[in-house]
Structures are given as structure tokens and as C-alpha cells.
């Protein structure tokens, strides 16, 4: 995303006033239990919704993977919110932000598909019962209502993103009506979300309560932990943000793109901060980015440990290992609840050290005869430092490519996290003019992103660099699930050119920033928590993490498996699931946030996969009879299919004549019948499911010439 595009984006609706009836009760809890009457009404509505639910509504990726059925009500939940590896029939539903329901859009929108889901009702769940699976302990069948009133002197915890998925991390802690937020990141869209730039946490449940937020604490500077901060600040711009030096620098740069000046407060591993009822102590954590912090959050309800993203690298490049002694001291104090990184809980053993990568890079770069291009995550300063050291040892200059890489390395060099001899780092323009064996390029594009620098090089579309036979390409990163096709596509294009591509499968050019199961056991044994809540992972990771906690002595009933929106209350030293709030996705699309829902994504997918058929029929407004033959236009069809569109025209004409013979002259009902018949015909004939867009225009028999304005006006009226 370029700078101008970022600056142009805006929040479509700012934080609104308190809920109706609460104007004079600003200290009411964020969530309250519905009264009995509203509960009964909600149950009835839910039952009706289940009876009429579209089959696709029941698909929820993560729970399907566990063999459990989805018990969510179609009226207030979105499908497939828990698994990144989803098909087009198992897409996440978006949460609308327009404050009004759109359940009837499928019927009222003349251009919509006939059998689409409806049901996004805005961010508030007022009075509705949100039925989901309970993920507490081994119980996967209990249905959860909306949570009751927050317990007095109890700690409430819920995630608005980042649990049951990897990305858009955001966890809220609530004590006595005050809120503390930990992290605020983004998730990047999958192929099932066309046209979406970013996916944000759902701010809806706290949007009207942001005045109660005492601070936003950020564990580290990765996009899935800081990327949504500018969007949150558009709802309240003075939230204090606590983070380490390097993390704050990345946040400041990101907010500058949005023309924001956030309230930034620097902390480190020795800091001890009081924010409202929350006492926050910090401890050093090792990850794949500098200055990571773990949290120890203390309230009268107890002590909570949040690991953030963590690994146990015993020989870290910066000499700053994860502070296990500090974690052990917290354990001596008594840890009531531990939120632990689950990303690599399914991988046995321990992860490798970043120090193990440096010798491999030095050898590969030293042996290379032509240009070397290394692709890495733009925030992995340690990896970039190892690459720069390898280039210096081989008498090569280094150039950074990719906007995020250039920005992050400028920050890292300015703050002293990246070190290179004077004159080593040069511009891309200078690099393009040098002999290939004298240059090393460090670029973005490890995941095959179409517009990333490495992908453009592979397609030979890069403005400054042309990859040649004999060049060495090092992919120094992990392969994110779901990106395999894109990454292998880039590798194949580079191989076709004649370049040599080295990945983590070929040599030790990458190590994970997340601890394996053996490292998580160390964490649990050091902290000795009474309760555990796995976070930062998909369901397979969360369940594996649960078993690790149990193996170290945590009572099975005290391990809480939650997904986004599940509310956990910690009272008297026991953490329990008490309900769930509606949490969906906020999509950033162009200049807006949140105006996309499941229907829009379904339309975009149908357009991309099935094409478009547009039918315009002009009828006598009294008799309903056609005044001229229907006009059919198509988009996205092959020439062979277009040649058969005469059949579509004939069917349209027959359908309209039959309806008129039955006395039908209502354009809306005619549109519905026409769409239904054409959809069935096209699917049977060509095995396609295009967007069918019929338009029926009522006119007097004397007026048969129809202009574009009349067609447009008729579509809008329908």
C-alpha cells in the first residue's frame, strides 16, 4: 500500500454515544446479561433462524476440523471465522458497520444472488443470544449465551482477534469497568476475500466504551500486533500506548502515514506501570524482532502472565534471551492465569537459534558468483544483520528493496539495532549500476505477494533489477500456510530464468521466531500457573498447547480453550468461560473500513469465478407483457458460452411471457422469478454460478425507447 492510499482511508463511523437507556450510567459494564424476556425472544428468533439457515452458514472451519458441529445462530454469527485454510464455501463473514441490518439485502438487491446468506446486524448484539460452542476444558457441546454482568472484583478477558487464528491479535482485560488492551494487529486476507486489503479486529464490542480504556500495551512490532493501531486511534486518538523503543518507532512510522500523532510511552523489561486498576510489569522476551516484551498484569483479582510471541533462543544475536528467571519469580509470587503463545505447539523439540543461520548465509554468499538476492520478513532485523555481515565478508554492497524493508531498516539503523560499515548500504539505483558479483539485495516478497519486489523480479517487471542466469536467490523465511501456490509460482519463475533458489528445505537459512513444544514446557514449568489459556494459534495449535499445560501440572479443568469473543472471568483464582459476545471481521477496502460483509464477498467471488449475466426486460406497466425482446449481456464468459446466450434470451422471454399470462405485472416479483430460473438453467447447462442481474422496467405501451438513465433508475428502485 502506498502512502497516499493509506492516508486516504477513513473510518466509516466513529465511536457512538452510549447505548439507549445508558446515557446517565457511564460506569455500567461493557456487557450485561439480557433479561429473561429478551432471552426468550432471542431463543425464538434463533430457532427460527436455524430453521431457515442456508447450509453454508453452518460451516465453521476450526470446529469442523475438530469433528464438532457448528451450533451458531445464523442471525448473528459469521461462518468460518476460525481457520485460515478455508474454501470459497467456508469463508468468514464480515461484520457490517453501518448500524443497520442487511439480512434482507439478498431479496431487496436486484443484482444480488438468489440464495445468499443474510444476517449481519451491525456491531451491537443488543438482546440477542449468541449461541456457540464452549471451548472450556473438554466440553465442546455447551452452548454459550451472552455473558452476565462482569463480576465485582473479578477480571474479565476476551479477544477481539487472534485466538483460533494467527493474526489481528487484540485481547481486552476488564476490571471494575476499566479496560486494558494488549496488542492491536491486522490479518492479511486470503484468496477467499477478494478486494480486501486488511482484516482488523472487531472493535464493535468496545467501541462505545473506549473512554474506559486505560492503556494499549503492545508486546512487539510485528504487523499482526501493531497494524490496526491507526484504525483504533481513529475511534479515540488519545489512548496511551505502552511499548518498547523499537516497537514505538514502528508504531510512530505507521501512524505518521495516517497523519496521526499518538500518545506513546516507552517501557522496557524493568518497567513497572500503573494504569487504572492494572499494574503492568514487563520482562524480556526473545522473538524474531528486537525489543519484545512479556507482560505480568496484576489486579486485585490475581496475576496474569501474557507471553506475547516467544521463543527460548539461548544464543540470541542481541544477547537478550527470554528472561526465564523473571518468569520463575512471577511463579513464586503466584500466577493465576497464563496466556501462552501456541504457534508452534504442535512441533516437537526446540526451535533453532538465530545464531545458527548466520554461518549458512556467510557460506552461501561467499560461494556465489553472481548477484545475491535475499528475501526476508521486513521486520526481522536479526536476519538482515546476518545477511549484511555475510555481504561485508564477501566484499559486497547491500541495497534494500521494498517499502516496508526500507522503512524498517532505516529505523533499525537509526536506533542502533542494525550496524554496517560506512558505505556498505547503498540505494537501489546505485546497485542496479554495479557489477552483479559486487551486490547483495535484501528484499520483501517471501510469501509470493504479487506486488512484492521479489515477485516483480520473477515476472521481470521490476524497474531496476533484472534477474539473470546464475543469480542466487535465498528465501530466508518460513512458508505461511495458504501461500504455497504463490511462493512456488515465484520459485518456478526464478528457476525458469536460470537463478538458483535456496529455501529452508535446502539449507539452514531460517529459524522460527516461535518456540516449539519443548520450549513451551519450560515456560509452564517456570510460571507454574493455576489456570492456562492458549492464545495466538489455530485450533490445532491451541489444543496442543492445552495438552502441554496439562502435562506440566495444570488441572485439565483449569485450561480454557477460547476463540475470538469467548468471555473468560477469573474469580477467586479460577478462570472460567461465562459466555460469548458477537465478534466478526472488519475489512479494509480502499478508503473504507467495515462496509464489506459476507454478501459482498460472495458477490465478488461469484463475479470472479462465474462471471456476470445481465438481462434487461421492458414490460407494459399494466399487463406485464414484454414490449420488446429482453436484452442479454455477459461478462467473464468464453466465446463458446457467449454463442449459447441465445438460449438465455429465449428462456428470459418465455419466463416473462408466462408470468404476464398469469397476470403478474410486479417488476420485483418478476425479477425474482427470472433470477431463479436463469440461475438454475445456467448451472445445469454450463456448470457455472454467475451473478444474475435481471432488470425489469415497467413502461407505457407508447414508450419503448429506454435510455441508460431509465435502466439505472429502475435497478435502483428495485
Swiss-Prot record:
Residue numbers binding Zn(2+) 2: 224-225, 309, 536
Pfam families cross-referenced by the UniProt entry: Lactamase_B_2, RMMBL, RNase_J_b_CASP, RNase_J_C
Localization in the cell: Cytoplasm
Primary subcellular site in the record, as a coarse category: cytoplasm
Cofactor detail note: Binds up to 2 Zn(2+) ions per subunit. It is not clear if Zn(2+) or Mg(2+) is physiologically important.
GO MF annotation list: 5'-3' RNA exonuclease activity; RNA binding; RNA endonuclease activity; zinc ion binding
Low complexity biased stretches: 55-91, 100-118
Cited InterPro entries: Metallo-B-lactamas, RibonucZ/Hydroxyglut_hydro, RMMBL, RNase_J, RNase_J_2, RNase_J_b_CASP, RNase_J_bac, RNase_J_C
A biological-process GO annotation: rRNA processing
GO cellular component annotations of the record: cytoplasm
Keyword Zinc-finger found: no
Region (Disordered): 1-130
Subunit structure: Homodimer, may be a subunit of the RNA degradosome.
Role according to the record: An RNase that has 5'-3' exonuclease and possibly endoonuclease activity. Involved in maturation of rRNA and in some organisms also mRNA maturation and/or decay.
Entries under PANTHER family matching the protein: RIBONUCLEASE J
Protein name, UniProt field: Ribonuclease J
Organism this protein belongs to: Corynebacterium glutamicum (strain ATCC 13032 / DSM 20300 / JCM 1318 / BCRC 11384 / CCUG 27702 / LMG 3730 / NBRC 12168 / NCIMB 10025 / NRRL B-2784 / 534)
Amino acid at each position: 500500500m502506498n502512502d497516499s492510499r493509506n492516508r486516504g482511508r477513513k473510518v466509516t463511523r466513529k465511536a457512538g454515544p452510549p447505548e439507549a437507556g445508558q446515557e446517565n450510567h457511564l460506569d455500567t459494564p461493557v456487557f450485561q446479561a439480557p433479561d429473561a424476556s429478551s432471552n426468550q425472544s432471542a431463543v425464538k428468533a434463533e430457532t427460527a433462524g436455524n430453521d431457515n439457515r442456508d447450509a453454508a452458514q453452518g460451516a465453521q472451519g476450526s470446529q469442523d476440523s475438530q469433528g464438532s458441529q457448528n451450533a451458531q445462530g445464523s442471525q448473528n454469527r459469521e461462518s468460518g471465522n476460525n481457520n485460515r485454510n478455508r474454501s470459497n464455501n467456508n469463508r468468514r463473514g464480515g461484520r457490517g458497520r453501518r448500524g443497520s441490518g442487511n439480512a434482507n439485502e439478498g431479496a431487496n438487491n436486484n443484482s444480488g444472488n438468489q440464495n445468499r446468506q443474510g444476517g449481519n446486524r451491525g456491531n451491537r448484539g443488543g438482546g440477542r443470544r449468541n449461541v456457540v460452542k464452549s471451548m472450556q476444558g473438554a466440553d465442546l457441546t455447551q452452548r454459550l449465551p451472552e455473558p452476565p454482568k462482569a463480576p465485582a472484583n473479578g477480571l474479565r478477558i476476551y479477544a477481539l482477534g487472534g485466538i483460533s487464528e494467527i493474526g489481528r491479535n487484540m485481547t481486552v482485560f476488564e476490571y471494575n469497568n476499566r479496560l486494558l488492551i494488549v496488542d492491536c494487529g491486522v490479518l492479511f486476507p486470503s484468496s477467499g476475500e477478494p478486494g480486501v486489503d486488511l482484516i482488523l479486529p472487531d472493535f464493535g464490542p468496545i467501541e462505545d466504551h473506549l473512554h474506559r480504556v486505560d492503556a494499549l500495551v503492545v508486546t512487539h512490532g510485528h504487523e499482526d500486533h501493531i497494524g490496526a493501531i491507526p484504525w483504533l486511534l481513529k475511534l479515540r486518538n488519545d489512548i496511551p500506548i505502552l511499548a518498547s523503543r523499537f516497537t514505538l518507532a514502528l508504531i510512530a512510522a505507521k501512524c505518521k502515514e495516517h497523519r496521526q500523532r499518538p500518545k506513546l510511552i516507552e517501557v522496557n523489561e524493568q518497567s513497572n506501570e500503573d494504569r487504572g486498576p492494572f499494574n503492568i510489569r514487563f520482562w524480556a522476551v526473545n522473538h524474531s524482532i528486537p525489543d519484545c516484551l512479556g507482560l505480568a498484569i496484576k489486579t486485585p483479582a490475581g496475576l496474569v502472565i501474557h507471553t506475547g510471541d516467544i521463543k527460548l533462543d539461548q544464543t540470541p544475536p542481541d544477547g537478550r534471551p527470554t528472561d526465564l528467571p523473571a518468569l520463575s519469580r512471577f511463579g513464586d509470587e503466584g500466577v493465576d492465569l497464563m496466556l501462552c503463545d501456541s504457534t508452534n505447539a504442535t512441533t516437537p523439540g526446540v526451535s533453532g537459534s538465530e545464531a545458527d543461520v548466520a554461518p549458512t548465509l556467510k557460506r552461501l554468499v561467499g560461494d556465489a558468483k553472481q548477484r545475491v538476492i535475499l528475501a526476508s520478513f521486513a521486520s526481522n532485523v536479526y536476519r538482515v544483520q546476518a545477511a549484511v555481515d555475510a555481504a561485508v565478508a564477501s566484499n559486497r554492497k547491500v541495497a534494500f528493496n521494498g517499502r516496508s524493508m526500507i522503512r524498517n531498516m532505516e529505523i533499525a539503523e537509526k536506533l542502533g539495532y542494525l550496524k554496517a560499515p560506512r558505505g556498505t548500504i547503498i540505494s537501489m539505483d546505485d546497485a542496479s549500476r554495479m557489477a552483479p558479483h559486487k551486490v547483495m539485495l535484501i528484499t520483501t516478497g517471501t510469501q509470493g505477494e504479487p506486488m512484492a519486489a521479489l515477485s516483480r523480479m520473477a515476472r521481470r517487471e521490476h524497474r531496476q533489477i533484472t534477474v539473470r542466469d546464475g543469480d542466487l536467490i535465498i528465501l530466508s523465511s518460513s512458508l505461511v500456510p495458504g501461500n504455497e501456490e504463490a511462493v512456488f509460482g515465484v520459485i518456478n519463475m526464478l528457476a525458469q530464468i536460470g537463478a538458483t533458489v535456496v529455501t529452508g528445505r535446502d539449507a539452514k537459512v531460517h529459524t522460527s521466531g516461535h518456540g516449539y513444544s519443548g520450549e513451551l514446557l519450560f515456560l509452564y514449568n517456570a510460571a507454574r500457573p493455576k489456570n492456562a489459556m492458549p492464545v495466538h494459534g489455530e485450533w490445532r495449535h491451541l489444543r496442543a498447547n492445552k495438552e502441554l499445560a496439562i502435562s506440566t501440572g495444570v488441572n485439565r479443568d483449569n485450561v480454557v480453550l477460547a476463540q475470538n469473543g469467548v468471555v473468560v472471568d477469573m474469580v477467586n483464582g479460577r478462570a472460567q468461560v461465562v459466555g460469548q459476545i458477537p465478534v466478526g471481521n472488519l475489512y479494509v477496502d480502499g478508503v473504507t473500513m467495515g462496509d464489506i460483509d459476507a454478501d459482498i464477498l460472495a458477490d465478488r467471488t461469484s463475479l470472479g469465478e462465474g462471471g456476470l449475466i445481465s438481462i434487461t426486460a421492458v414490460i407494459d406497466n399494466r399487463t406485464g407483457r414484454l414490449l420488446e425482446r429482453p436484452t442479454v449481456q455477459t461478462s467473464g464468459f468464453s466465446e463458446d458460452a457467449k454463442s449459447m446466450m441465445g438460449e438465455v434470451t429465449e428462456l428470459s422471454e418465455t419466463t416473462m411471457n408466462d408470468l404476464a399470462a398469469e397476470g403478474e405485472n410486479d417488476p420485483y416479483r418478476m425479477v425474482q422469478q427470472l433470477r431463479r430460473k436463469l440461475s438454475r438453467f445456467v448451472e445445469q447447462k454450463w456448470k457455472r454460478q454467475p451473478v444474475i442481474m435481471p432488470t425489469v422496467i415497467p413502461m407505457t405501451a407508447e414508450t419503448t425507447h429506454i435510455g441508460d438513465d431509465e435502466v439505472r433508475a429502475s435497478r435502483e428502485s428495485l
